Regions:
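Binuclear metal-dependent hydrolase catalytic cores
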Residues: 2-155
Length: 155
């Protein structure tokens, strides 16, 4: 598929605790240098597809996702690719529910089996309607299992 306006943006490149780290007085954490202020790991790919639709693919959903999305002025999310199941890469998943509302559609998520199982366990209120005891607005997600060494075609 031909794409235009392709960009890859690191949304966060910090450690699992972010930088600065809470209650740390080391030189990096107390630095005034803006390069020493780093959010946790996420990234996004933006492009215009062959049909002229602007697309956004998130890579991981860090706990800092809301702040990252606001900073980058992202207004949609067409898919999410999870690299692995660590909480610093998954705990921002709840934030994507606003994209569901804006786009009026579900979001495909892609991950290996172990990561999908982790997401189902941690966010059971999203994947199992009977676990959403308050009937609150939750993300509308479509899980897709990735197979190791197999190509991935999103659109």
């Amino acid at each position: 598929m031909a794409v235009n306006n392709f960009s890859f943006t690191f949304l966060g490149t910090g450690t699992s605790a972010g930088v600065p780290v809470i209650a740390c007085d080391c030189d990096v954490c107390t630095s005034e240098d803006p390069r020493d202020k780093r959010l946790r790991c996420s990234a996004c790919i933006r492009f215009t597809d062959a049909g002229g639709i602007d697309r956004v693919i998130l890579i991981d959903t860090s706990p800092d996702l809301r702040q990252q999305v606001l900073r980058e002025k992202l207004e949609r999310c067409d898919a999410i690719l999870f690299t692995h199941q660590h909480v610093d890469h998954t705990f921002g998943l709840d934030e994507v529910r606003r994209f569901n509302m804006v786009m009026n559609q579900a979001i495909d998520i892609y991950a290996e089996q172990a990561t999908l199982q982790h997401l189902h366990r941690v966010f059971n209120h999203v994947f199992e309607s009977n676990k959403n005891v308050n009937d609150s607005f939750v993300a509308n997600l479509i899980p897709n299992e990735l197979q190791p060494d197999e190509p991935l075609c999103l659109f």
